[in-house]
Amino acid sequence: MKKLEALLENSFNIRFDDKRLLETAFTHTSYANEHRLLNISHNERLEFLGDAVLQLIISEYLFAKYPKQTEGDMSKLRSTIVREESLAGFSRYCSFDAYIKLGKGEEKSGGRHRDTILGDLFEAFLGALLLDKGIEEVRRFLNQVMIPQVEQGTFEKVKDYKTCLQELLQAKGDVVIDYQVISETGPAHAKQFEVAVLVDEDRLSKGTGRSKKLAEQDAAKNALAQLSEV
């Protein structure tokens, strides 16, 4: 963890008082499960906390930055900023991917490069930083790492297929859109999900992905392509 501590201090001017929090943030469940006798904590609880503080800080930023935008527009932009792929990208930008502790099976299957794991890692780090330093330090870190990309308009170019599908269908009248998991295959470290998108309980299309969120986006993308051919 010494190299990680040096990275945080040199790149972001962050120094943890409670080193155990930092280590927990970078410990995946697969590693903790393989070392049960050591009673090692993993990062899922910190991820929960980090997700909450990230949503709050980004919401506050968008509210202040875009006084004329509607609630719907701000929600759409926020969802692209905090989506799995975006957070995984920030983990890579910060070089966090080099320091996460993974189980042997997860490591062999490419877990170090998986968006789901890296996105969760970024949130877990925020949770640990919140507990160790407080919300203003989390805000400072996000202002350094995330906000510059927001201000460059990076996320306004990202397609949220679920939102696009919802807007298209609801423009034609009130409809109920639902996403249902059809199948879940593969070992825990390499899951593959198949999801169907239903409109008023009728199946419109299907999609696949390494997580439920990615499979839902793929299903919505396929539905939009299908509707464009009608």
From Swiss-Prot:
<feature type="domain" description="DRBM">
    <location>
        <begin position="160"/>
        <end position="229"/>
    </location>
</feature>
<feature type="active site">
    <location>
        <position position="123"/>
    </location>
</feature>
<keyword id="KW-0507">mRNA processing</keyword>
<dbReference type="InterPro" id="IPR000999">
    <property type="entry name" value="RNase_III_dom"/>
</dbReference>
<feature type="domain" description="RNase III">
    <location>
        <begin position="5"/>
        <end position="134"/>
    </location>
</feature>
<keyword id="KW-0963">Cytoplasm</keyword>
<keyword id="KW-0540">Nuclease</keyword>
<comment type="similarity">
    <text>Belongs to the ribonuclease III family.</text>
</comment>
<dbReference type="GO" id="GO:0046872">
    <property type="term" value="F:metal ion binding"/>
</dbReference>
<keyword id="KW-0698">rRNA processing</keyword>
<feature type="binding site">
    <location>
        <position position="120"/>
    </location>
    <ligand>
        <name>Mg(2+)</name>
    </ligand>
</feature>
<dbReference type="Pfam" id="PF00035">
    <property type="entry name" value="dsrm"/>
</dbReference>
<dbReference type="InterPro" id="IPR014720">
    <property type="entry name" value="dsRBD_dom"/>
</dbReference>
<keyword id="KW-0699">rRNA-binding</keyword>
<protein>
    <recommendedName>
        <fullName>Ribonuclease 3</fullName>
        <ecNumber>3.1.26.3</ecNumber>
    </recommendedName>
</protein>
<dbReference type="GO" id="GO:0006397">
    <property type="term" value="P:mRNA processing"/>
</dbReference>
<dbReference type="GO" id="GO:0010468">
    <property type="term" value="P:regulation of gene expression"/>
</dbReference>
<dbReference type="InterPro" id="IPR011907">
    <property type="entry name" value="RNase_III"/>
</dbReference>
<feature type="binding site">
    <location>
        <position position="47"/>
    </location>
    <ligand>
        <name>Mg(2+)</name>
    </ligand>
</feature>
<comment type="subunit">
    <text>Homodimer.</text>
</comment>
<feature type="active site">
    <location>
        <position position="51"/>
    </location>
</feature>
<dbReference type="GO" id="GO:0005737">
    <property type="term" value="C:cytoplasm"/>
</dbReference>
<dbReference type="Pfam" id="PF14622">
    <property type="entry name" value="Ribonucleas_3_3"/>
</dbReference>
<keyword id="KW-0819">tRNA processing</keyword>
<feature type="binding site">
    <location>
        <position position="123"/>
    </location>
    <ligand>
        <name>Mg(2+)</name>
    </ligand>
</feature>
<comment type="function">
    <text>Digests double-stranded RNA. Involved in the processing of primary rRNA transcript to yield the immediate precursors to the large and small rRNAs (23S and 16S). Processes some mRNAs, and tRNAs when they are encoded in the rRNA operon. Processes pre-crRNA and tracrRNA of type II CRISPR loci if present in the organism.</text>
</comment>
<keyword id="KW-0694">RNA-binding</keyword>
<dbReference type="InterPro" id="IPR036389">
    <property type="entry name" value="RNase_III_sf"/>
</dbReference>
<dbReference type="GO" id="GO:0008033">
    <property type="term" value="P:tRNA processing"/>
</dbReference>
<dbReference type="GO" id="GO:0003725">
    <property type="term" value="F:double-stranded RNA binding"/>
</dbReference>
<keyword id="KW-0255">Endonuclease</keyword>
<dbReference type="GO" id="GO:0006364">
    <property type="term" value="P:rRNA processing"/>
</dbReference>
<dbReference type="GO" id="GO:0004525">
    <property type="term" value="F:ribonuclease III activity"/>
</dbReference>
<keyword id="KW-0378">Hydrolase</keyword>
<keyword id="KW-0460">Magnesium</keyword>
<dbReference type="GO" id="GO:0019843">
    <property type="term" value="F:rRNA binding"/>
</dbReference>
<keyword id="KW-0479">Metal-binding</keyword>
